[in-house]
Swiss-Prot record:
Keywords: ATP-binding, Cytoplasm, Kinase, Nucleotide biosynthesis, Nucleotide-binding, Transferase. Belongs to the adenylate kinase family. Pfam families: ADK. ATP binds at G10, S11, G12, K13, G14, T15, R126, N209. It catalyses: AMP + ATP = 2 ADP. It comes from Lawsonia intracellularis (strain PHE/MN1-00). Consists of three domains, a large central CORE domain and two small peripheral domains, NMPbind and LID, which undergo movements during catalysis. The LID domain closes over the site of phosphoryl transfer upon ATP binding. Assembling and dissambling the active center during each catalytic cycle provides an effective means to prevent ATP hydrolysis. Pathway: Purine metabolism; AMP biosynthesis via salvage pathway; AMP from ADP: step 1/1. The gene is adk. One of its GO terms (cellular component) is cytoplasm. Catalyzes the reversible transfer of the terminal phosphate group between ATP and AMP. Plays an important role in cellular energy homeostasis and in adenine nucleotide metabolism. Residues 125-164 are annotated as: LID. Gene3D superfamilies: P-loop containing nucleotide triphosphate hydrolases (3.40.50.300). This is Adenylate kinase. GO terms for molecular function: adenylate kinase activity; ATP binding.
Amino acid sequence: MNILIFGPNGSGKGTQGELIQKAFGITHIESGVIFREHISKGTELGKQAKSYIDKGELVPDDITIPMILETLQIKGKSGWLLDGFPRNITQAQKLHEAMLKKGVKLDYVIEITLPREVAKSRIIGRRICKTNNNHPNNVSIDSIKPDGNNCRVCHGELIVRTDDQDEEAINKRHDIYYNTKTGTLSAAHYFKNLSDQYETHYILVNGQNTIEEIRKTLLEDLGISSEVS
């Protein structure tokens, strides 16, 4: 099973990705991690990517896509969920073309929808548990509100990421994501428009539901009961 997942920052995309990974035993692959791994290992693609990153420039698609495909084929032999790529319509088209050439089948595309202002509020309200950063805490979401100043799961210390409070940075990220002409949503919709032709199932889920409600919907749409995961 091979899956692309889309959702704005603040939608809980990462949390749902981890839950899907555990339920299906597939590999959760994040584009940012791929860059870091290639750079730390000193691969040829990693060296090329680093030369752009060090200059504060975007890594070209002709470096990024081979890097991602290589990771999918090596780490995702039993299935994968790709998170964080593609980010725009051009990348979607190039990724699709590359997957066709390599014979890589895309089975599902997940889009978690969330109004922009709600997504922004959630980012600002996010709190990170120092003991375990997989423990969800958010002052803007009733179902996962912290226990005062402590983690709702383990009562550990909570911290606030400075970039979560930078409204200008949040707005820039969301400008890219919510752009339906050339941005990340246009990439998601590119695959949606091809879903019938390539037998790819497109799943739309309401990100304003609780983590458990979203999980239940996704697992059922992906073909298993949430009771057995």
